[in-house]
Curated annotation (Swiss-Prot):
Binding-site residues, Zn(2+): C119, C121, C129
Encoding gene per record: hemB
Cofactor dependency: Zn(2+)
Name the UniProt record assigns to this protein: Delta-aminolevulinic acid dehydratase
GO CC terms, sorted: cytosol
EC number per UniProt: 4.2.1.24
MF-aspect GO terms: porphobilinogen synthase activity; zinc ion binding
Binding of 5-aminolevulinate 2, residues: S277, Y316
Listed Pfam families: ALAD (PF00490)
Binding site for 5-aminolevulinate 1: R208, R220
Catalytic center residues: K198 (schiff-base intermediate with substrate), K251 (schiff-base intermediate with substrate)
Organism: Synechocystis sp. (strain ATCC 27184 / PCC 6803 / Kazusa)
Length: 327
């Protein structure tokens, strides 16, 4: 006890502090999200997400090269199609925007890992993540018919060269359905990163501007999780593990670090944390107003995800963080 035990002894110098640091953020932890749109030479900034852009495929390739040069190992692609319909055709069509972006990136930067978001909300004309009953205005997605769309989408993305399939729609049984579809088409070696614990969160607002994916009516609470629940997250993860998930994700991250920790304690699989758009935009807005030190707050936040148990971090801060970590 004091005065014999003095924890401050190990905090006296920067070198000592670094030697005993329990969790260290590295560029290898980072995954950078990108939004692909039709056209050429397009780089349209998302108003609610300073520094984030909707990009045409040629610009996506430029970004992918920069990401690679910064040492970031992976990107995750989201698509914004020109046309939307009830069948989410743009999600699974071989000439879909994400398929084109995937092919272009893998050709130009073959060593960069391309993760593809496997969801339907950006591609449906109602903004929900699957088929709806005729006349439904509440957002109650028909689960099992939607699985058929997700299977087609995953196979199409794999055909385009995706390295990792990341289903995010929170449909019951979606991991098993996608795993079986991939295996049936000789894609046994493509891993699945499941959005296993995805909450119905208010932090997604800016993303829906970026991805043009806001529901036209109702909400997503019948398929995304209640923010008040934690045991349910463990159940979702357990089911996804049984269905064949190779990695699992918690989304959002900042307000759900207890969930990251609990999931990390229950599984040996890699756990990803999605530092979502609202979390990003709050930091950006405060920094632009001079209220916080953007670099310090960002690196502290990302390190906290590591401390909570995240092995991978999807973040719009990835490029900035990579530069800061090099300094």
């Amino acid at each position: 006890m004091f005065p014999t035990i003095r924890p401050r002894r190990l905090r006296q110098t920067d070198v000592l502090r670094r030697m005993v640091r329990e969790n260290t953020l590295t560029v290898n932890d980072l995954i950078y999200p990108l939004f692909a749109v039709p056209g050429n030479a397009i780089a349209k900034e998302v108003v609610s997400m300073p520094g984030v852009y909707q990009l045409s495929v040629d610009k996506i390739v430029d970004e992918a090269k920069e990401v690679r040069d910064l040492g970031i190992p992976a990107i995750i692609l989201f698509g914004i199609p020109e046309d939307k319909d009830t069948d989410a055709t743009g999600a699974w069509h071989d000439c879909g925007i994400v398929q084109k972006a995937t092919e272009a990136v893998k050709k130009a930067v073959p060593d960069l890992v391309v993760i593809v978001d496997t969801c339907l909300c950006e591609y449906t004309n109602h903004g929900h993540c699957g088929y709806l009953e005729t006349g439904d205005l509440t957002g109650r997605v028909l689960n099992d018919p939607t699985l058929e769309l997700l299977k087609k989408t995953a196979v199409s993305q794999a055909n385009a060269g995706a390295d990792v399939i990341a289903p995010s729609g929170m449909m019951d049984g979606f991991v098993q359905a996608i795993r079986e579809a991939l295996d049936d088409h000789d894609f046994q070696n493509i891993p699945i990163l499941s959005y296993a614990a995805k909450y119905a969160s208010a932090y997604y607002g800016p993303f829906r501007d970026a991805a043009d994916s806001s529901p036209q009516f109702g909400d997503r609470r019948t398929y995304q999780m209640d923010p008040g629940n934690s045991r349910e997250a463990l159940k979702e993860v357990e089911l996804d593990l049984l269905e064949g998930a190779d990695m699992v994700m918690v989304k959002p991250a900042l307000s759900y670090m207890d969930i990251i920790w609990r999931i990390k304690e229950m599984t040996n699989l890699p756990v990803a944390a999605y530092n979502v758009s609202g979390e990003y935009s709050m930091v950006k807005a405060a920094a632009l107003n001079g209220w916080i030190d953007e670099q310090k707050v960002t690196l502290e936040t990302l390190t906290s995800f590591k401390r909570a148990g995240a092995d991978l971090i999807l973040t719009y801060h990835a490029k900035d963080a990579a530069r800061w970590l090099q300094d």
